[in-house]
Amino acid sequence: MNSLSEANTKFMFDLFQQFRKSKENNIFYSPISITSALGMVLLGAKDNTAQQISKVLHFDQVTENTTEKAATYHVDRSGNVHHQFQKLLTEFNKSTDAYELKIANKLFGEKTYQFLQEYLDAIKKFYQTSVESTDFANAPEESRKKINSWVESQTNEKIKNLFPDGTIGNDTTLVLVNAIYFKGQWENKFKKENTKEEKFWPNKNTYKSVQMMRQYNSFNFALLEDVQAKVLEIPYKGKDLSMIVLLPNEIDGLQKLEEKLTAEKLMEWTSLQNMRETCVDLHLPRFKMEESYDLKDTLRTMGMVNIFNGDADLSGMTWSHGLSVSKVLHKAFVEVTEEGVEAAAATAVVVVELSSPSTNEEFCCNHPFLFFIRQNKTNSILFYGRFSSP
């Protein structure tokens, strides 16, 4: 394995397996946002602390000696994980008329800690960000509000109150914040007049009413006979990004699919070689999800222990002793409509829809399914989710 996108996908699945243990219903998060924030900590970490971060994020498989390079700032060599992040974030944050995509990271550090200039220069270069000097010791509540306000501004006010009351104390020293915002319109929009109330079955015994969008069109599609499921790619305008949907054949088939799913299988199933353009009768519910995660215990369970306690070696960040990561909170929001994802009321693009083609396949998302949003050029998964309860 040599690419950051592959490492990100592997970490995404490790995280998903942890979330599955405690969350039976909806799941939604941004793996690339979390890894980029932790990458900034890795840039200032050394020895065991750096090795633990690298191993959990699968960065140790991206290039050799990543941790050593990170600690000494010798990170210009092409292929190095931080260098790859620099290219990736530049690619993501390019302005385009087709969609809005913005990834923003920030570290908020207790102002009594003096951060090294080399570190500040490096995170600016590779992660397009800075350390914000923050008075946690004397003004924890004001600090909390300041962080929340920054997150709101970076996510078009979709993510509010990332840090609830009481989550920032005067013993806080370092807070990682990652924010990602995406708004895209479908390449082929759903016609609103085709949206009807239909049943969605969370399980075989109960159903809930949803607004089910529908369109007949040509999509990249594949049957996954070995796991009794099918996969469909729904492109966004410009086709730089897509939503990929994994749908079990049976109403209660999601658990079996999740158990068999791996990063390697996902990449294989959704490759251009495996999928073919097919006429599909697509039924997709209109939905909105907002999910929050406190990742500290999850990351510790996965093996990232030192950064959260007195053993943290963040001497590449500061000469001061006692610095450790206090919080890693993550919140993600998605809204899927006829227009697209988190679509604004912009001028409509007229799309010529196929006039009732002879449908080869039906893809009816009326029971729990998995979905993810992918940047196709870099094969990077921006968001990953499970929709199982409207």
From Swiss-Prot:
Localization annotation: Cytoplasm
Gene Ontology MF terms: enzyme binding; protease binding; serine-type endopeptidase inhibitor activity
Biological processes per GO annotation: negative regulation of peptidase activity; protection from natural killer cell mediated cytotoxicity; regulation of proteolysis
Tissue distribution of the protein: Squamous cells.
SUPFAM superfamilies: Serpins
GO cellular component term, pick one: cytosol
Sites marked Reactive bond: L354, S355
Superkingdom: Eukaryota
N-acetylmethionine: residues bearing it: M1
Alphabetically ordered keywords of this record: Acetylation, Cytoplasm, Protease inhibitor, Serine protease inhibitor
PROSITE patterns xrefs: SERPIN
Principal place of residence: cytoplasm
One of the Pfam families matching this protein, by short name: Serpin
UniProt-listed PANTHER family: SERINE PROTEASE INHIBITOR, SERPIN (PTHR11461), SERPIN B4 (PTHR11461:SF186)
Role of this protein: May act as a protease inhibitor to modulate the host immune response against tumor cells.
Protein family: Belongs to the serpin family. Ov-serpin subfamily.
Protein name: Serpin B4
The organism of origin for this protein: Homo sapiens (Human)
Gene: SERPINB4
